[in-house]
Amino acid sequence: MNRKQIAKGKLVRRFGINIFEQPKYDKILKKKPHPPGMHGKARKAKITEYGKQLIEKQKIKFTYGVSERQLPNTFKEAKKHHGVTGYNLLSILETIIDNIVYRAGFAFSRAHARLIVSHGIVILNGRRVTIPSIILRANDQILIQEIDSLKKLIGSNIEQTSAQRNLPTGIELNADYLNIKVKHAPSRDEIPTLANEQMVVEYYSKRA
């Protein structure tokens, strides 16, 4: 296990949930269900309400790989939309291009998806893009560059991720042509519950 995997392993143990949605971290949680530095059934320190909100915010930050600057900006955008702010926040994060690439199985993880986008492998609506934080809208389409080696690689990724793929109804995948079409944002039921988004709303609302 390399250094990055060890760091991610500590994060899933700290949060007590597999925020990276990869089987290897389920194994880590099963083997070591307690947080790093805590052994056996040691008593947990009491966490304040602020501490709980901070933990939920960190879960979302690390799940989607967003920065400390990007997340509050996304929250501000979510507040502008009609409806429930917590759902709006998750909906925006789910429709960022790197997450769509990950959900469709083009990549093994969101970090892998960010690399794919930043390396210019992805074509969005006919134009090559390199910014993994682009928010997609209905009818946006993603293709892979017309390079045989790249298409073969992404095709292989799709095959290998098929068993664990969590593809919302709003994403249409054509695995034969390596094409993704965004139809609509996912419903709340289609978004894995990896954090309490209402606590994140409370966290940022107090700092507005």
Curated annotation (Swiss-Prot):
Transmembrane segments: none annotated. Residues 95-159 form the S4 RNA-binding domain. Part of the 30S ribosomal subunit. Contacts protein S5. The interaction surface between S4 and S5 is involved in control of translational fidelity. Belongs to the universal ribosomal protein uS4 family. It comes from the Bacteria. The keyword rRNA-binding applies. This is Small ribosomal subunit protein uS4. GO terms for cellular component: small ribosomal subunit. SUPFAM superfamilies: Alpha-L RNA-binding motif. It comes from Borreliella afzelii (strain PKo). PANTHER family: 30S 40S RIBOSOMAL PROTEIN (PTHR11831), SMALL RIBOSOMAL SUBUNIT PROTEIN US4M (PTHR11831:SF4). HAMAP family: Ribosomal_uS4_B. The keyword RNA-binding applies. Keywords: Ribonucleoprotein, Ribosomal protein, RNA-binding, rRNA-binding.
